[in-house]
Amino acid sequence: MNNYKNELQNLKVGRFRVSPMSQARSGGGFDALVSISSGQGMASVDRVMRFTPRFRSARDAVRYARAEGLAWARAH
């Protein structure tokens, strides 16, 4: 369980803060989401991406969101 909490932590990549998360689907399974934010105050920007694969567990969804968010932040 401790590793799962580590996977949920915000990650700093350059000027971006990557926040992976999961959300339960009403029909079962989980969605993977990631928030990528930058800036401060009035100049802050937050992008939220929801990915199409359905996951069997919240942990798997968070792992996927984390990997995708890190890849996006490193590419930008």
Feature roles, as predicted:
Residues 27-29, 54-55, 73:
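A short local loop/turn or secondary-structure capping micro-motif enriched for an aromatic residue
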Residues 63:
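Structured alpha-helical
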Residues 67-76:
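Short arginine-rich
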Residues 1-39:
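N-terminal segment of the canonical double-stranded RNA-binding domain
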